[in-house]
Amino acid sequence: MGRLIRRMIQKKWDGNTQRDAIRLASQTPPQGVDVWEGLPYEEDGHPMHTLNLYRPAGVSGPLPTVVDIHGGGWMYGDRQLNRNYCMYLASRGYAVMGMSYRLVPEVTVAGQVQDVFSSLHWLAEHGVEHGFDLSRVLLTGDSAGGHLTGLVAGVQLSPDLQKLYQVDPLPFPFSALAIAHGVCDVYRFRLFTPLLDRALTREYLHLMLGRPWRRSPLRGHVSFEDTAPGLPLPPILVIASQPDRYYAQSQRLMRYLDHSPFPHQVIHWSRQQSARATHVFEVGWWDWPESRDTNDRTLAFFDQVCRGDFS
């Protein structure tokens, strides 16, 4: 059963590779943006230890910072996957960084957290020279990247989690978080029949936490609801849509936040508002009106937090 599930997972992400290549080839990137591509944040030569920087062309001086963690089920994608999305954010007047990180099964989720932190430490050292204002930082991610956004934010605020994940805290705080269609509950994906869903989740947990996952020291310290309690998290924006096949994950996150002390807002698309507002639509199809609206509202939320107007 486990081998069959692994083949299903791999086939799914192989299909995404082809679909995303077609999607990106069909799109015209946003204009008026300077891009620095493939900058190494580790000196080991690993192709996934690289990042991209984006800034609006012709604009000098420090700009508020957006850090984007791409999705892809923890086992697919790189810094180029969300390139057009990051360019759109930069075109609106922001300094944007998006990194590659090693994928499972090469590493567990701990290795991914380590890579994200390493890229952020690089930004702490080099961001100012590229015009990144690190007193105003929005951390955002979509799908699995949304999960990593919540996890990285928690690790940054918890010495115990820093020890577990073997990272050093950053010298700057996150001003706000934006979790887009986040798959933040890794213990139950809620996609198929209960039997198949349990099998899929079990195999993913082996990949993410190490086999056997039930004996992993990461168990109980990886989902948002594991790590968030008791931490002084910054304001959180949740982006959710009913046509999203992972909508149950967004519903669970929204319910959790509604019963928590964490300040948060929601951008929600109903099926009636847009039937094509599917999983991570605003990232994959940056030029749709729904996407522009969502991304502009995300940046408005960030601006509101930075002005101190969020309540």
Tell what function each PLM region has.
Residues 1-311:
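Alpha/beta-hydrolase superfamily serine-hydrolase fold, recognizing
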